[in-house]
Amino acid sequence: MLQTNNYSLVLLIQLALLTFDLFVNSFSELLRSAPVIQLVLFIIQDIGILFNVIIILLMMFNTYVFQVGLVSLLLERFRAMLILSALYLTLSICFHCWVMNLRWMESNRFVWTDGLQVLFVFQRIAAVLYYYFYKRTTEYLGDPRLYEDSPWLRDAFARARQ
């Protein structure tokens, strides 16, 4: 079971990773003259997104709902967040690779092609949705009812057995 002090630490780590992600999305263009630093920030950002997904999955695996075998209930509840996380990670990696490929040798050259601008917009929209759904999922996974036996869980288990 996730204890209150453990949940606070996990929540702090998740929010720190989300804040770093937001920081890189907001200010990475200011570092275009230093492509190595920008590359390192992009790599750390992608690893942070991956860590956030792993943390959410571990929190899901830790719930009583998962332990009694109602995985479908969790997947139904968190499907949007899991899909958005995968989409956001994919769009971020694609955007980072494309920008670094175009900008590596000539960092002050205008590299914003039409395709890159479209990818940029989709990546940023996915980022906003990812932040919202991730934070909502994190708060929902802090609900103590997910970590103990309860009447609604017994009803869900009975429906799943039929």
Curated annotation (Swiss-Prot):
GO terms for biological process: cilium assembly. The keyword Transmembrane applies. It is found in: Vacuole membrane; Cell projection, Cilium. Glycans are attached at residue 6. The chain crosses the membrane at residues 7-27, 39-59, 80-100, 110-130. Disruption phenotype: Ciliary phenotypes such as pericardial effusion, curved or kinked tail, as well as gastrulation defects. GO terms for cellular component: cilium; vacuolar membrane. Pfam families: TMEM138. Keywords: Cell projection, Cilium, Cilium biogenesis/degradation, Glycoprotein, Membrane, Transmembrane, Transmembrane helix, Vacuole. It is a multi-pass membrane protein. Required for ciliogenesis. Belongs to the TMEM138 family. PANTHER family: TRANSMEMBRANE PROTEIN 138 (PTHR13306:SF6). This is Transmembrane protein 138. It comes from Danio rerio (Zebrafish).
